[in-house]
Regions:
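Gly/Pro/Ser/Thr-rich low-complexity, intrinsically disordered segments predominantly at protein N-termini
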Residues: 1-213
């Protein structure tokens, strides 16, 4: 049962606004104490009303919580952001690069809202107040034991189907990077941190992760 329906059933005599406020409070409390209900279909309004600081993604009505990243995860993400931003700036490019919190409405609608570790958008018409609406050009995920299955499975499929041009999966544990260039249909390429990794979206950019982490 939808949480709003549940609260309204319990408070039939309340004013509509008061009942809606009670429903929102109940929703936040349930999420904080119990986590998302696997049997419930969550809406974009539910997603936007998540308690402040609670990071999650929305895929076809299902909420997926995101764990707090490790220190190394943050270092890699930050250094990638610096490297890409500096490259774009040095070339006078129009592409934009973002790190979380930054929502990607990967299908262009409200059904799938993801939060990649690094997002590069070259078509500025896709950028809005709420994030990116449509497929970014380049996405990077810094994987962890808790996210690896989704990064290599669900997200890989969603990014490819949406039209993302390039997708990197960085594994800090074994210091490797998997690169997918969906735009050309090439097979995945595998790199170690101490190798110079070429970027498809920016052909004159190469990144050696061992230089920064």
């Amino acid at each position: 049962m939808d949480y709003r329906e549940l609260v309204r059933r319990e408070c039939p005599d309340m004013e509509a606004i008061a009942c809606e406020t009670a429903a929102e409070a109940f929703f936040r409390k349930e999420l904080l104490t119990k986590g998302p209900d696997p049997d419930m279909e969550y809406s974009i309004e539910d997603f936007r009303n998540l308690p402040e600081g609670l990071r999650a993604e929305l895929v076809d009505g299902k909420l997926i919580y995101l764990e707090a990243p490790s220190t190394l995860h943050q270092e890699i993400k930050g250094e990638m952001h610096i490297a890409v931003a500096n490259h774009i700036r040095s070339k006078g490019g129009r592409c934009k690069v973002y790190i979380p919190p930054f929502d990607v409405y990967i299908s262009g609608d409200d059904s799938k809202v993801l939060e990649p570790d690094l997002t590069v958008v070259c078509d500025r018409s896709k950028l809005g107040k709420k994030g990116c609406h449509g497929a970014p050009d380049w996405i990077v995920e810094v994987t962890s034991p808790s996210t690896r299955r989704r990064d290599l499975g669900t997200k890989l499929f969603l990014y490819r189907e949406a039209g993302v041009r390039e997708y990197w999966i960085i594994n800090p544990e074994n210091r490797t990077v998997i690169v997918y260039v969906f735009e050309t249909g090439e097979d995945a390429s595998f790199y170690a941190f101490d190798e110079s990794i070429p970027c498809h979206v920016f052909p004159d950019l190469k990144i050696r992760l061992s230089d920064v982490v």
